[in-house]
Amino acid sequence: MRMTAMLAGAVLLTAGSSAHADYSLLVKSNCLACHQIDKRKYGPKLNEIAARYADDRNALETLAAKIKAGGSGVWGEDIMPPQPQVSDADARALARYVLSLKEAR
């Protein structure tokens, strides 16, 4: 029983620190200059992006590619400028974090 409680605690700490690390990556990568989680700034809300791609089984790869290469036309006239300075691994981590923010439908 004690071992189970310790393992559960370790899992919770790991999950929490992972989410914190990914949010920190949003800050470090300057994503929050245009996006916020639940409010529209210049670009779409991050949880709105997550909701749009919720049923797309290629969403992780699609969003990671858009982070790196940029894109336009998906959100009206909004343009996502390319972010070539973001590593492939960080682009995937950012995409994974954004997809975790899906709004309740």
What are these regions (language model features)?
Residues M1-L7:
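Bacterial N-terminal signal peptides that target proteins for export
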Residues A8-L13:
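Hydrophobic helical h-region of N-terminal Sec-dependent signal peptides
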Residues A15-S18:
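N-terminal signal peptide c-region/cleavage motif recognized by signal peptidases
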Residues L26:
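Flanking scaffold residues of small Cys/His-coordinated metal-binding clusters
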Residues S29-I37, L94:
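The canonical Cys-X-X-Cys-His
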Residues Y42-Y53, K66-A93:
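Axial heme c-ligation environment in periplasmic c-type cytochrome domains
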Residues A104-R105:
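Short, solvent-exposed mixed-charge patches
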